Amino acid sequence: MGKDKKYFLDEKPEKLTYGGVFRRINDWARARSLWVVAYGTGCGSIELRPTFTSRFDAERLGMRMVATPRQADVLIISGYLTVKTLKRVIRVYEQMQSPKYVVALGACPINGGMYYDSYNAINRLDLYLPVDVWITGCMPRPEAILAGFKRLQELIDSGRADGWKKYIDNLDRYRENQKKIIKNWKMPNYNW
Amino acid sequence: MEVLNRLREKFEITGDKVQRDDLALVETTGKDLIPVLVYLKTYEGFKTLVMISCVDWMEKGKFQLSYNLWNPEKKKNIIVKIFLDRENPVFQTIYKIWPQAEVYEREIHEMFGVNFEGNPTQDEELILEDWEEIPPMRRDFNTLRYSMEKFGEREPKSGIIIRKQISEQYDEWRRK
Amino acid sequence: MSKEEVRLFIGPQHPGVTGNMSVEVLLRGDTITWARTHIGYLHRGFEKLMERKIFIKSFPLVCRICVPEPDTNEENFARGLEELAGIEIPERAKWIRTLVLELSRLQMFIMWYGGIAGSMGLSTPVQWGIGDRDYILDLFEELTGGRIYHIYIMPGGVRKDLPEGFEERVLKVMDMVERRLPEYDEIIMENAVVQKRLKGLAKIPKEWVDEMGLTGPVARACGFPYDVRKDHPYEAYPHLDFDVITEDGCDAWSMLLVRRREIDLSIDLIRQIIEKMPRGEFLAPLPNVLYWKIPPGETYVKSESTRGEYGFYVVTDGSDKPRRVHVNGPSFVHGITLLERLLVGQNIADVAPIMVSLQTCPPEMER
């Protein structure tokens, strides 16, 4: 890992274009196999465990946890995001392959929740990442999470979950917002 | 607790209080703190350092450092505290007495800006990353204002307007 | 770092670490030669936020400090405020609090029991552990209205009395959990892989316990009978009959045995509590909590969580807000000072079992 290696996107990637019946088939298939990157960014990850194990069993809906972002379709922002985590989350998000979807869990990514006055937790997630589905609650129950995923599946199936396209189109604007709170874009040498 | 009498005989103790049967508070001077800690560890059986904490007394211009020790045999806690000048808070490290003190001091250095001379890792970032303001746990750091300036409004302008309309409608409805 | 060594970063986005934290290690072959814990990914500044909120408004915040086991925080903070304000709480409230604490310990232990197996690649106990924990979460939901965050314990007692017939339902769940445990034992304890990997893993030198301030199951696995419930009895624990569990192996296997026996102990304690619980008031009369001022003072209260001694250092200055609240979780020492020293010389594949054995909980390290 060289010192000037690029950790983040610096130009717009090529947008994937496909249409017609292939798009329809792709969307149908994608909606039925959502792989979630296993990154518990906040306290919401405690309710993801029941969701993905025996009692609520999200695997029957085609969802499972995967370890690496390169295989994943969905990034769950589980609860509040601190500035330090936001940097990692952006990096994880940019490593994921399109099409990719973001689900925001809990009240904190919406408007800061109970950490609205905290110096280290962001207030609004949609300034920094495009969000496809919001699930409210603190914490959202597993039923609510499943309902949110159901909604995400509907959106994907009908071709309306296009947050990743928005991110590519408005990369400059998102990057400007991100740069407001992340001053140093070099990853520290203890993780990259 | 009897240990307080012995401490009073040997060291300069500026105040003490028995808070509970198993918890005593002792106040001493910065000069005597390390002898007190070593004495408590070697002779009185307070072998374990539970925590180091810092309190900001901004009005008095002081930082309070509290060293919390535990005696595993007699099951007693003792909190030894000292006051530092707030303008130039410097103190010695005690990580050679207890290894875990290193991380506690590193956290206090980051959160309050107290300097611990001789601590090898205190300048490494522990919790915050690229922090540019005054240390955040100081009383004069306004976290709400910082949050508003850095992270923006909690909701978009349209949301505030809608909320205002709703509350006005609600007020009207209540007046009826 | 020499040329033969490789720097490896475990976390924060890694399924093996216990939450959102990261460990940086240097590797020589498969062996770790140096380790450093990095935290701060979950730092929300609780202690700062509590300084600008009145006492009662801090309670929704305080339970979020440790996510899997929130009740210890509430109970500690409430007990600290009661001590400083000089409030005596009714006898029944103490017993209900003890019941809630034990239930929350039990659910955490059951999840942990599955988790330690999961860290070694056995995924069946993970499913069982989290599934069986849900029965206890259902009890919590009935009692407090929330599955994870309860905000049930408040200064002066508890928010509501037990619902009718709650005791029987608790006992029923206890019977169910007890019936399930032999199956767990069969799949975890008698598993050759678990035995081979955990026996002798992460051996802690005995002198580290007092020197570093190790507590809870980690200290008890080294043969030190440190248990806050026995040493500094709080709430209803003085009236309960139990022995401190110790093992003498100092390794991850002993920690597993200690926690396994703690499950039995928790079930036994819950039965004792329900049997001995007195009737009466559950909330002491409080002043108007919106204008509640507590005289100046400072105290340190502690209780036994699943990970060890959990302490709250509360300083008040006579106003309606706390001057300083310092939360001292056991993971702060276990996860940084101990883990950094313990990983040296271990195999890279054993990082996850060691972290789960120490039960490091990042949100309580950085608050």
Predicted regions and their residues:
Chain B
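Terminal low-complexity/charged segments
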Residues: 1-176
